[in-house]
From Swiss-Prot:
Protein name: Fructose-1,6-bisphosphatase class 1
The enzyme's E.C. designation: 3.1.3.11
Recorded GO CC terms: cytoplasm; cytosol
Subcellular location(s) of the protein: Cytoplasm
Amino acid sequence: MQTLAQHLTSKAVNESLAQLILTLADTSKAISHAVRHGALAGVLGATEQENVQGETQKKLDIITNDMLKDALKADGTVRGLASEEEDHVVEVSANGQYLVCFDPLDGSSNIDINSLVGTIFSVLPAPQGELTEASFLQSGRNQLAAGYVLYGPSTMLALTTGQGVQLFTLHPETNEFLLTNATMSISPDTSEFAINMSNQRFWEAPMQTYIADLLLGKIGPREKSFNMRWIAAMVGDVHRVLSRGGIFTYPTDNKDPKKPYKLRLMYEANPMAFLVEQAGGKASTGYETILDIQPTQIHQRVAVILGSANEVDACLSYHGIDSRK
């Protein structure tokens, strides 16, 4: 089996970009170690702090954020970073070539129940000149690399550099990421969907109707039965979609009119959309292709519908969108 370093060489990935990816991967190994120790290391539970989104930060949110910041500062290739846990962009190295956006611990509400969590990252080119928030406001099409690390029964890294999606598994003895799936591919059709049904009454009419038709199964207009899955961590739900197909959605809702969207564009939706498109799937807000969105702020939120291409098309048809044109 190829190691991650060997794979990056075989794909002729730019040397400095490969170095950055290896830094992210090495840091995820340390994060995996911290997650596994959990209560034994006293890292579970919440702090008394909130992040810029107004969410109470878990101890591991802060620990993993600091681990990634420290590693990226030492790497030398990074101009600046943006994190879910940082109010503002962070300047790293004046000579850096890349910008890194990340969610250090996606699904952190799962920590205290010992369920799935992960790290999501996106790499963008660093523009010339002074580093500001505007430096990061590039569409997802500009991403040079994206991926996530899933801390589950095995620690797994899903990665794209624009040459398909590869899956690596962390060997528990050698502590190396080894290539275990060279070509992740999302089947175009599916009978699985992932959504937080508790928000059903707050959705827009198109999503209400779409899900209602799925639940009708064989007796409904879709004429087949669907199963629902929900992990409550985007990284886990998207990993399932990449592994066996499906559709994942966190749609617009009016539960809190000031926050109609849940997921963040720069370090959740964009990297996941890049992975999904590279694996043959589609990713949309319901009205716009995610990777085509021009960001307006680093913590911008968007609706997300992604997964098996034909099922995403079916969902979009309820929104009056024909994505096959």
